[in-house]
Amino acid sequence: MRRALRAWGRAQGGTAVSATPGTLAVPPAQPPQLLYAGEVDGAAVVLFHDRGVRVVRYAEPRAGSGAPALDFARTDGADVTTGAALVVSRDGDRARFLMAPWIARTTTRDLLSPNSPARALEVNADGVTAAVPRPSPGGRCDSWPVLQLRSSERIVENHAFLLTDLGDLAPVHLTFTPGPAARAGARQPREATSTPALLAWARTACSLTALRGSGVRAVNNWNFAEQRLPESGTPAQWLCTRADTWQGPGRVMVQFLPPSASLTGPGTVVGDERDTARCSRFGQHVLAGTRWRAPSGHWYVLAAGSRAVSRIEATGAVRESAAGTALAVRAPRDAPVELTARLKEGGSLTAVR
């Protein structure tokens, strides 16, 4: 522990130092709190909490010539979910986590197997889990392991939630906002443990690869619209996947989910914006569009908006408008088309690009 504190105060040459975006890799301003000290996977590991601001991990190999590592991550404002676990060790394609004392049940599941039950995960007396698979950092996305945790009833009654490892010290909280219901008001994000939530994440989990190592705190899947496709009338879903970071700015990816014979048929990312309030409580209106080819071979421009959209307009190579939250118009595959929407309470909206 002394070497860990010494390295934090002044990292020596040969110590690998990393910090998630927005995290200061500087010495502590006051004595830190010790969270864990022990040997894990052949390394001596120490975890400190910098009084609600940062988590710092120091690790040095017990044998061999590997260099010590010092990792910094922001945790200011962490709550029951975002402060529930920390990465203690990563070894190849597996990781171990330190569980918070308020976690009563620890399980794992695969987002790409939404119908499979969660499996029990062993936790030792020090609060460290057995090694669990990590999402693959590249290549094929044929599974997406997550932690499914349940907090003690002394904290929040019957509260289960999902966390996933995106490469930072603090795993990322996954949530879900269901689609609009008739005569219902705006809905809030909820835990992604329901059947609709798991089915939505089964088709969008692989898009999380784009968020690795970017200091993400939480990701919400908002099912903001359903659209009946032209010619067949079968329903397609529109989701806004919003990532909030510890340092503040958010990123959104709008995904179009046409009907699929597979529960894990991936959606198509049709819009990607950074440093935006869209799809948050500060940006509750969204419009998106894409090109889609019908089984007949005809190409269409499709557009959909959230519940406050009253009319969608297409201009450019085609000119068309439709009342409500969805539009479909025949158009050549590469025809330039601009999409705008009007809101029920006034004002306009441009599409996520």
Features from the language model and the residues they span:
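Short, surface-exposed polybasic-aromatic patches that bind anionic ligands, especially phosphate groups
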Residues: 1-353
